[in-house]
Amino acid sequence: NAVNSNLAYSPQFITNDYKRGVKILTHIENQLMHCDEFSISVAFINRSGFVELAETLKELERRGIRGRILTTDYLCFSEPYALDKLASLTNIQLKIYHVKDKNNGFHTKGYLFRENGIYRIIIGSANMTQTALSTNMEWNTQLVSTEQGEMAKSIVQEFERLWKDELSKSYDEFIEDYRKIYNRKKNQIGRAHV
């Protein structure tokens, strides 16, 4: 027997499908434009990912919608340019999780949006890169829950745990060290291809 449920609370599968004109980016932008606050935890952020979301994030800055973004130095993939641009937005707190142990990576991909006590959470494979948000084959699930829902509570608690972890460094505290590591790694890769 089928059980009727409120469609607004039904989970959604979200992917990119250029044939149908569907992008993960559209779902994320829509949630950003309707939320009271947001928290994002992604392993990788690059210039193209910031550019994809820039206008929406600037609109949220104008409206005073606060957000937190947690990324990482894992694999030195996140581009300092993109981090600089995110940190320049006055409504966003940015932290970088410092992976000290090479065997203990940081590979999260979660977008949490809160509006009037309701969470809409997108979790899956999409980093904050243009290809992940618009063209790659990515699989994500959007969950909708009240603040009291067990799944939402678990996800929010895990975000808070990572956000408060001593390895999560503020942008101001860690960006110069990260920039040096990133440039060193980029130079090593460049020399390897010569």
Regions found by a protein language model. Give the residues of each.
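PLD/PLD-like phosphodiesterase catalytic module centered on the HKD motif
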Residues: 1-191
